[in-house]
Amino acid sequence: MNQNIEKRLFTSESVSEGHPDKICDQISDAILDEVLKQDKNAKVACEVFTTTNYLLIGGQISSTAIVDYEQVARDVLKKIGYVDDAYGINANTCKIDIKIESQSPDIAQGVELSNDQIGAGDQGIMFGYATNESKTYLPLAITIAHELVYNATSQRKKGLFKWARPDMKSQVTIDYTNINNPKIDTILMSIQHDPNYNEIEFKKYIKENIMDLVAKEFNLNTDFKVLINPTGRFVIGGPQGDTGLTGRKIIADTYGGYSRHGGGAFSGKDSTKVDRSAAYMCRYVAKNLVAAGLADKIEIQVSYAIGISQPISIFIETFNTHKVDLNTIYKAVYENFDFSVSSMIKTLDLKKPIFFKTSKYGHFGKKDLSWEKLDKIEVLKEYKKCS
């Protein structure tokens, strides 16, 4: 490591939709969406556990919706490509247990308040972040890491990526030594494969048709260090290789460790759970502030108490990149954004069944998500004039 002692290297990781934890996230959000299609006011907290050819679906769901949870789970597995016992779980043969109950009435009385107000479903802290270092206003490392496993999965599903199986991970190290010209230092990919495969051809395909392809998409270098399946073999994968659980990839789901995280997971939770809705709102606000030019980087923290609709606190960090006085940024936030639970749900249209698409390859950076819209730029630019 001596040769890198003066380098500024930052690393983030992502996982494919076939990773055991992501299987669980997708099933949790697929169930949430199916419930919301029938009952937009449903209260959902759904979690999934998986191991070799087995799923356990549990949680609390209060709703008038009638949903075949088992069928939803099997459909998700089929979409991923888990239709072979050798892969670690098989949509057609796996055992599924259902342990779903109704929401606690003690929680319900704190959520449903008068005058159309909604109390926070729990206490907690949430963060949102944006940076102008990429077109999606996300850090480069996590953005590239997502694209690698997304691209590899797409090629596998199309039959182009020979020998590949569903379970994959990526890890990207960005060299920020020249802060104005970041480059890729290292890419690591671990990709499950068939037992009878040509290792040299497999790795060559990954470097040329996945790693290099993605690097070029971002107009970045292709002379990075390469690590592919460092143990030498990755046949046993999926839930057979590791157990999976909803909510265990919260850093890959957000900013790849580049920003702080409050600890609350997203998948399987309806929008009255501020772990999800407030984190989305913080991202929405931070992204619009950065896009409006008020700072190069912004991180927003909020906190809530169960049963109370308004946040307990709001904190804004710009990492000394603000272009206007920090008090002006606070003023812009307080005058243009409402962090009450009911307002966040309305602003971001969070009663719609939109959550399955967030359950893989990150909850941020996708254009068609409401919290990614840039509809406050012009009004926020006005604050640059009065600073």
Curated annotation (Swiss-Prot):
What's one Pfam family the UniProt record gives for this protein? S-AdoMet_synt_N
Which CDD domains does the record cross-reference, listed alphabetically? S-AdoMet_synt
* Residues binding Mg(2+): 21
Q: How is the cofactor bound?
A: Binds 2 divalent ions per subunit. Binds 1 potassium ion per subunit.
Give the matching NCBIfam families.
metK
Compartments (UniProt record) = Cytoplasm
List GO BP terms, alphabetically: one-carbon metabolic process; S-adenosylmethionine biosynthetic process
Q: Which UniProt keywords apply?
A: ATP-binding, Cytoplasm, Magnesium, Metal-binding, Nucleotide-binding, One-carbon metabolism, Potassium, Transferase
- Name the pathway it acts in: Amino-acid biosynthesis; S-adenosyl-L-methionine biosynthesis; S-adenosyl-L-methionine from L-methionine: step 1/1
- EC annotation? 2.5.1.6
Query: Where L-methionine is bound, by residue?
Result: 103, 242, 273
What this protein is called in its record is S-adenosylmethionine synthase
Query: Is Ribonucleoprotein found in the keyword set?
Result: no
Cofactor or coenzyme needed: Mg(2+); K(+)
One MF term in GO for this entry?
A: magnesium ion binding
